[in-house]
From Swiss-Prot:
It is an enzyme of class 3 (hydrolase). GO terms for cellular component: chloroplast membrane; chloroplast thylakoid membrane. Residues 91-120 have a biased composition (Polar residues). In the N-terminal section; belongs to the AAA ATPase family. Binds 1 zinc ion per subunit. InterPro entries: AAA+_ATPase (IPR003593), AAA_lid_3 (IPR041569), ATPase_AAA_core (IPR003959), ATPase_AAA_CS (IPR003960), FtsH (IPR005936), P-loop_NTPase (IPR027417), Peptidase_M41 (IPR000642), Peptidase_M41-like (IPR037219). This is ATP-dependent zinc metalloprotease FTSH, chloroplastic. Its EC number is 3.4.24.-. It comes from Medicago sativa. The active site is at residue 516. Its cofactor is Zn(2+).
Length: 706
């Protein structure tokens, strides 16, 4: 059986490792670095001496093959001859005595010239890889030209036709081509590649720079500027909301319970609408108006009403929006806000919660170049600086006027400070009427009674009250909101929701009933003290029971408390502990802990701040250094000696002991009423003020006289 050299070598490379091959000299071929240049792996079998003839034959075949390569015949311009042929006699194979599949008697004969036929070549200009390998092994491929990346090659067949082949990752391809006498070359690319690479190296950085330039231009004034899609320079842009014709849906008619504040702001609105009326008298438009008041009193609502009434351009923002991640953003946004406002003058700029940037300077904490200080300095300059802000009215709101910088509050910046305080009874009635719109109310709902039971409530508190009452009515499947739902909603807001599933033992229930009865009894018999509104032993929140007193409206509005009222307040707070002592000193509980804290706080204020101590006198001590973060003193030093501190402690103890004695005297005198009231609470769990007073009248109780 005859084997061609190409067949023998291809068999060796395709894995026929049982055929030993000698070490040969590799053909000198210029190949790209990424191709594998290993052609043969010599396999030496020292234990088999019968393989020497086949080794000699293979060596001769390789020598003949290398002698007839195109490189060797290039000088004569002759075509390369076909490779030599190894002939092996099949009857000489002796597998039992040799590891080679061939016998030792192998003769090397000259190759027989054969005419190449082009009819066996594939058609088309694109060959499959398997077709390409078959053509190479049959000697029908003259040369190949690899692309620069080695993924594609172009072949030239012996008949001159050309075709392209997609090259897979085959490490044996170069070996196969070399052993079959195929000329190998690599494409160096197009002639213009060098120029293209040079231009590309310059073009890419230019495009990157142009892209960055467009992004920054977009952030400064392009589509990403004010009202745009955003950009990196938007950090310095104000985030204020602008309305050319404000449509807040709120007018002064929707604001109730703040008549004085409305009057002040209505003048500002009238100034914008009718400036000639004021300028004829030489009046100047106020530059700023600061709304001051507790949280929930309607400062922002008033600002929305101003926007709805004025009919002028309106800018609104929160002070916290000025300060961002980067240093200097606050001052930049203040400048941007006032630049836009001046372009729309006359207009109104509303800054909510201005204490976020307007805090007092000079504390020195966090360095002298504090970001907040830069922002407030820029704000001061814009409001009343060298250039002024003609036509721009600044409307601001805060619930912390004590922390604002004095330079911000002076006339010329904030000319007016409008106090928006908690509403009185008449104001609460109007607010309840506003927030009851759209709600189905029963006929027994009396706004005047609700207003008198809610002293100190702000507009937001009353809005929440009516909303909670509506939710309770819906939960109970009612079609109207009655006074019971409003009363339950009020207790829920003050003390928390009822613990309906709480398991309370009879002993604990009795103890809580006596504790609350003690508070109510002492409070009702103290002269000039608040009347009892309701007593309940239903657990709510953290409290096991509650006693509601109706504080005086006049006392709340004025904030003036007499010495007798404070002494009565301490006695009422201690009435619960005194009532628990009915069961013996060993049965008192920790339920009076909050009462003790309240008593101690009131007694210490009476001695240190109010001048109600004869030994200390009319002196305020223990004021401290103030809050260092508000620009005040860092440390809080005592301004009195240790001897004075001992006197203060003794005076506080004396006031508390006196209040305890008064509560004990009242309960011991009216012990029968205490038992009846506690029993009534155990039975009903809730006793209102009218039922409580009827019990007092029946028991012929008398007011305490010191």
């Amino acid at each position: 059986m005859a084997f061609s050299t190409s067949s023998l070598l291809s068999t060796n490379f395709l894995g026929a490792r049982n055929i030993p091959t000698p070490k040969t000299t590799k053909p000198s071929i210029s190949l790209p670095l990424f191709f594998k240049t290993k052609f043969f792996n010599s396999q030496n079998d020292n234990n088999n001496n019968n393989s020497e003839p086949i080794k000699s034959a293979a060596v001769s075949a390789l020598i003949l093959s290398s002698m007839f390569t195109p490189a060797a015949l290039a000088a004569d311009n002759l075509p390369p001859p076909p490779p030599p042929v190894l002939e092996a006699q099949p009857n000489q194979l002796n597998p039992a005595n040799s590891t080679s599949p061939f016998s030792q008697n192998i003769s090397l004969t000259a190759p027989k010239p054969q005419a190449q036929s082009s009819t066996d070549l594939p058609d088309g200009s694109q060959w499959r890889y398997s077709e390409f390998l078959n053509a190479v092994k049959k000697g029908k491929v003259e040369r190949v030209r690899f692309s620069k990346d080695g993924s594609v090659l172009q072949l030239t067949a012996v008949d001159g036709r050309r075709a392209n082949v997609i090259v897979p990752n085959d490490p044996d391809l170069i070996d196969i081509l070399a052993m079959n006498g195929v000329d190998i070359s690599v494409s160096e690319g197009e002639q213009g590649n060098g120029l293209f690479s040079f231009v590309g190296s310059l073009l890419l950085p230019f495009l990157a720079f142009a892209g960055l330039f467009l992004i920054f231009r977009r952030g400064q004034g392009g589509p990403g500027g004010p009202g745009g899609l955003g950009g990196p320079m938007d950090f310095g842009r104000s985030k204020s909301k602008f309305q050319e014709v404000p449509e807040t849906g709120v007018t002064f008619a929707d604001v109730a319970g703040a008549d004085q504040a409305k009057l002040e702001l209505q003048e500002v609105v009238d100034f914008l609408k009718n400036p000639d009326k004021y300028t004829a008298l030489g009046a100047k438009i106020p530059k700023g108006c600061l709304l001051v008041g507790p949280p929930g009193t309607g400062k922002t609502l008033l600002a929305r009403a101003v926007a709805g009434e004025a009919g002028t351009p309106f800018f609104s923002c929160a002070a916290s929006e000025f300060v961002e991640l980067f240093v200097g953003v606050g001052a930049s946004r203040v400048r941007d806000l006032f630049e836009k406002a001046k372009s729309k003058a006359p207009c109104i700029v509303f800054i909510d919660e201005i204490d976020a940037v307007g805090r007092q300077r000079g504390a020195g904490l966090g360095g002298g170049n504090d970001e907040r200080e830069q922002t407030i300095n820029q704000l001061l300059t814009e409001m009343d600086g060298f250039s002024g802000n003609s036509g721009v009215i600044v409307l601001a709101a805060t619930n912390r006027p004590d922390v604002l910088d004095s330079a911000l509050l002076r006339p010329g910046r904030f000319d007016r400070q409008v106090t928006v305080d908690r509403p009185d009874v008449a104001g609460r009635v109007k607010i309840l009427q506003v927030h009851s719109r759209g709600k189905a109310l029963a006929k027994d709902v009396d706004f005047d009674k609700i207003a008198r039971r809610t002293p100190g409530f702000t507009g937001v508190d009353l809005q929440n009250l009516m909303n909670e009452a509506a939710i309770l009515a819906a939960r109970r499947d009612l079609k109207e909101i009655s006074k019971d739902e409003i009363a339950d909603a009020l207790e829920r807001i003050i003390a928390g929701p009822e613990k309906k599933n709480a398991v309370v033992s009879e002993e604990k229930k009795k103890l809580v009933a006596y504790h609350e009865a003690g508070h109510a009894l002492v409070g009702a018999l103290m002269p000039e003290y608040d009347p009892v509104a309701k007593i309940s032993i239903i657990p709510r929140g953290q409290a096991g029971g509650l006693t509601f007193f109706a504080p005086s409206e006049e006392r709340l509005e004025s904030g003036l408390y007499s010495r007798s009222y404070l002494e009565n307040q301490m006695a009422v707070a201690l009435g619960g502990r005194v009532a628990e002592e009915v069961f013996g000193q060993d049965n008192v509980t920790t339920g009076a802990s909050n009462d003790f804290m309240q008593v101690s706080r009131v007694a210490r204020q009476m001695v240190e701040r109010f001048g109600f101590s004869k030994k200390i006198g009319q002196v305020a001590i223990g004021g401290g250094g103030g809050n260092p973060f508000l620009g005040q003193q860092m440390s809080s030093q005592k301004d009195y000696s240790m001897a004075t501190a001992d006197i203060v402690d003794k005076e506080v103890r004396e006031l508390v002991d006196k209040a305890y004695e008064r509560a004990t005297q009242i309960i011991n005198t009216h012990i029968d009423i205490l038992h009846k009231l506690a029993q009534l609470l155990i039975e009903k769990e809730t006793v209102d003020g009218e039922e409580f007073m009827s019990l007092f009248i029946d028991g012929k109780a008398e007011l305490y006289v010191s």
